[in-house]
Amino acid sequence: MQISPEILPRIIQAIAEAIEKNAEAVTQLDQAIGDGDHVVNLQRGIHALQAQSAEIGQLDWAVVMQKIGMTLMSTVGGASGSLYGTLFVTIGKALRDKTADLPAFAAAFAQGVESVKLRGKADAGEKTMLDVLIPAAQSLQNSADASISLQELLADVTHAAETGVEATRKMLATKGRASFLGERSLGHIDAGAKTAQLMIAAIAAVIASSGAPT
């Protein structure tokens, strides 16, 4: 299965709508244990991508992933800009000179997540976006190797992200401002994990509705 980059403007728009719809709720999560500016910072990057969406849809996957990464690095404040920038730049490099099929995307996404782990000096279980990205990447790789339909694959990845974000509620924060709260960080969902889950769900919904072949 191959999907054209021409789908990216729709994906970017869907992400923008999902973050805007949930902005107040996510900001409340962030204010509880974080800095409270996560959504504002993230939306700055999303708006920059929206402004470039027509151009982005005409590039090949390797180039466009790196372009998205550099845009996020330069426009999103806080740790999120650096981490998401690293994710997409690494994906782009991994796709260079590759056929952009599902196994290649799964492998590239996994490499991107590994780069985020290194850049953020974090891993699963530390109440960060990685608690969504890691299981989503694992699910994508597992599903890419299995003989299942595209709809099943997307459902599996979406479910993995949902399970991951909910799991942060019971985690003790060890990164960022939330880490200073100690046990008071327990009982709260991580805002960065939540926006990662929202974006994965938005991406999956657009691909599912595109009628792309398996």
State where each predicted segment sits:
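N-terminal loops that bind phosphate or other acidic moieties
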Residues: 1-214
